[in-house]
Amino acid sequence: MYQRCFDNASETLFVAGKTPRLSRFAFSDDPKWESGHHVHDNETELIYVKKGVARFTIDSSLYVAHADDIVVIERGRLHAVASDVNDPATTCTCALYGFQFQGAEENQLLQPHSCPVIAAGQGKEVIKTLFNELSVILPQSKNSQTSSLWDAFAYTLAILYYENFKNAYRSEQGYIKKDVLIKDILFYLNNNYREKITLEQLSKKFRASVSYICHEFTKEYRISPINYVIQRRMTEAKWSLTNTELSQAEISWRVGYENVDHFAKLFLRHVGCSPSDYRRQFKNCFAEQEILSEFPQPVSLVG
């Protein structure tokens, strides 16, 4: 038997009216997943590594996350995520927005120059259970639940991550700055990957030679500008294949290819299987039994 009573004294962590809201949840179990560099302008991502090893590049720094590690990628951070080839990762991600901790900027959770990857400590089992619940409930909900329920998840996770990262290791040097021009080019490609983009267009827009752009971009991001665009398109195509019922032709058009056959050939070349095979393998219909077998039996948060 145990009972604990609480007084009415409250500690306000958030600025009034600035509590977290959930904008996106993602579950990734593709053993060859590689996102490519990208940016979220208005979201902060809270990531939980369920199993395996994931590699994160965040603002020029490389971090390796293992099972039961938690990761924070704040809005505006240039980042890339890749599953380890030898120990593929399964990850869960909640993207939050609209929150502001006391004394911090909007959507900022980390202390300045904090390491964004740590082992989950305080509330570890609760974090695991919350992500498990979202993995089970969301695929079955079909918008039947109110947004307040999802925001309750966001609120709880934000506080748990905040408490875990409060004393995380901090680097005195802070974040390494990349070449500003090359970073601007990547931001442009990230935001306009659906458009027809040529090296000549980039050269004219950014007033730099084609050879300079190709050399410096490839040196910085280990991929050429054009292959980055292709990778970005393939990443979006994967999400559409596994989370929508859109036809291949519609997906092809949405990611920037007018010719569906050309899209299918590129997908096969870069992903290693056809779009239809990828959809069959990773379609968002994972069985609840598979999830529950790897997590503790969840405590139901809904009646």
Swiss-Prot record:
This is Uncharacterized HTH-type transcriptional regulator YdiP. SMART domains: HTH_ARAC. Disulfide bonds: none annotated. The keyword Transcription regulation applies. It comes from Escherichia coli (strain K12). Residues 183-281 form the HTH araC/xylS-type domain. Keywords: DNA-binding, Transcription, Transcription regulation. The keyword DNA-binding applies. InterPro entries: Cupin_2, Homeodomain-like_sf, HTH_AraC, RmlC-like_jellyroll, RmlC_Cupin_sf.
